[in-house]
From Swiss-Prot:
One of its GO terms (biological process) is exit of virus from host cell nucleus through nuclear pore. Interacts with protein M1. May interact with host nucleoporin RAB/HRB and exportin XPO1/CRM1. GO terms for cellular component: host cell nucleus; virion component. Average number present in a viral particle is estimated to be 130-200 molecules. It is found in: Virion; Host nucleus. The keyword Transport applies. The gene is NS. Its main location: virion. This is Nuclear export protein. Pfam families: Flu_NS2 (PF00601). Keywords: Host nucleus, Host-virus interaction, Transport, Virion. It comes from Influenza A virus (strain A/USA:Texas/UR06-0195/2007 H1N1). Mediates the nuclear export of encapsidated genomic RNAs (ribonucleoproteins, RNPs). Acts as an adapter between viral RNPs complexes and the nuclear export machinery of the cell. Possesses no intrinsic RNA-binding activity, but includes a C-terminal M1-binding domain. This domain is believed to allow recognition of RNPs bound to the protein M1.
Length: 121
């Protein structure tokens, strides 16, 4: 896993948690929770790829890992749309920069998860 991506996750999550978006703060907290969940999932896939022969272990531990993988891609797509929406509706430049970086990070994570999953198939 790229240490830049890890620090990007931590930086964006910290900045998002400091934002005061009024009535939408519940939505933002949900996004933060999903970002954290996505990071953990990506990390676990990366670890599985790094251990040779771990596909059998992954399948045994989670018999429906392909279904879970599909759900994670749906979550990523949903988060991308949410971040795009927030980006369009905010006028605060700090928030715009944060959401632009979050969007870029989502694209990177989607690509990493795709790469990991292809290696596991």
């Amino acid at each position: 896993m790229d240490s830049h991506t890890v620090s990007s996750f931590q930086d964006i999550l910290m900045r998002m948690s400091k934002m005061q978006l009024g009535s939408s703060s519940g939505d933002l907290n949900g996004m933060i929770t999903q970002f954290e969940s996505l990071k953990l999932y990506r990390d676990s896939l990366g670890e599985a790829v790094m251990r040779l022969g771990d596909l059998h272990s992954l399948q045994h531990r989670n018999g429906k890992w392909r279904e879970q993988l599909g759900q994670k891609f749906e979550e990523i797509r949903w988060l991308i749309e949410e971040v795009r929406h927030k980006l369009k509706t905010t006028e605060n430049s700090f928030e715009q920069i944060t959401f632009m970086q979050a969007l870029q990070l989502l694209f990177e994570v989607e690509q990493e998860i795709r790469t990991f999953s292809f290696q596991l198939i």
